[in-house]
Swiss-Prot record:
This is Cofilin-1-A. Pfam families: Cofilin_ADF. The keyword NAD does not apply. PANTHER family: COFILIN-RELATED. It is found in: Nucleus matrix; Cytoplasm, Cytoskeleton; Cytoplasm, Cell cortex; Membrane. Keywords: Acetylation, Actin-binding, Cytoplasm, Cytoskeleton, Membrane, Nucleus, Phosphoprotein. Expressed diffusely in both animal and vegetal hemispheres of the oocyte. During cleavage, expression accumulates around the cleavage furrow, along the vegetal membrane, and later in the midbody. Strongly expressed in the animal hemisphere during blastula stages, with most cells showing expression by gastrulation. By stage 17, expression is highest in cells of the developing neuroectoderm, and at stage 24 the notochord, neural tube, neural crest, somites and some cells of the archenteron show high expression. It comes from Xenopus laevis (African clawed frog). GO terms for cellular component: actin cytoskeleton; cell cortex; cytoplasm; membrane; midbody; nuclear matrix. Residues 4-153 form the ADF-H domain. Transmembrane segments: none annotated.
Amino acid sequence: MASGVMVSDDVIKVFNEMKVRHQLSPEDAKKRKKAVVFCLSDDKKTIILEPGKEILQGDIGCNVEDPYKTFVKMLPRNDCRYALYDALYETKETKKEDLVFVFWAPEEASLKSKMIYASSKDAIKKRLPGIKHEWQINTYEDVNDPCNLADKLGGNTVVSLEGKSVRS
């Protein structure tokens, strides 16, 4: 079911910036986004960047100790969101970095919010081509455990996420 919701040009621009990994100057590399959260505009007609809900690569190690935990804290307890998370992980063979499209639909969100976000998900996904991983999350228990993201990225082959071990 399509909702008729549009995707803002800013969302597409941020996605393209996150998707392309090329040699950046040290200054530009610090400005590269690690995570962003998208929400619906007040009139519920456009998917937009949620103001202030981003993590920059340059923040990591300065005012962001654990990018994954910081990302989790950006998700509202009682409303839906979309997000992009640039996951840095290691498998038994190699280090990898992949974008993950996140659909956050917590149990505490209103039915109306869940319905409009669910029906608009295809609209945003069509505008963000080439994403390898999609993760729908409905509880804080699921999102708080980095092993769940590791499972989405490669199951038992993933040994660390953001430099932290995910397997005991």
